[in-house]
């Protein structure tokens, strides 16, 4: 595997793990507290990334989207 392929693989793996950590619907994933991110200033790049994520329906720990999806619970 070349160094470019290795770097790409690592970046994709990191991205998948990050999405798993912040996706609220995913079972058995870590949930970080939202109040910890409230003090972090948002730069233009993060603001753009958050607007794209919110438009796609993802609400992450870093991005606080105004439109939230409802929580669906199932009972067995």
Curated annotation (Swiss-Prot):
Keyword annotations: Acetylcholine receptor inhibiting toxin, Amidation, Disulfide bond, Ion channel impairing toxin, Neurotoxin, Postsynaptic neurotoxin, Potassium channel impairing toxin, Secreted, Signal, Toxin, Voltage-gated potassium channel impairing toxin
Arginine amide modifications at: 69
GO cellular component: extracellular region; host cell postsynaptic membrane
Main localization category: secreted
Keyword match Signal: yes
The protein's role, per its UniProt record: Highly inhibits both nicotinic acetylcholine receptors (neuronal (alpha-3/beta-4) and muscular (alpha-1/beta-1/epsilon/delta) subtypes) and the voltage-gated potassium channel Kv1.6/KCNA6 subtype.
Comment, domains: The cysteine framework is XIV (C-C-C-C).
Family: Belongs to the conotoxin J superfamily.
Protein name (Swiss-Prot/TrEMBL): Conotoxin Bu28
Species the sequence originates in: Conus bullatus (Bubble cone)
């Amino acid at each position: 595997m070349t160094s470019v392929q290795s770097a790409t693989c690592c970046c994709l793996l990191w991205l998948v793990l990050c999405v798993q950590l912040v996706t609220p619907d995913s079972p058995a994933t870590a949930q970080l507290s939202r109040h910890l991110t409230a003090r972090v200033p948002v730069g233009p790049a993060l603001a753009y990334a958050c607007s794209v994520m919110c438009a796609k329906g993802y609400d992450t720990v870093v991005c606080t989207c105004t439109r939230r999806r409802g929580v669906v619970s199932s009972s067995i």
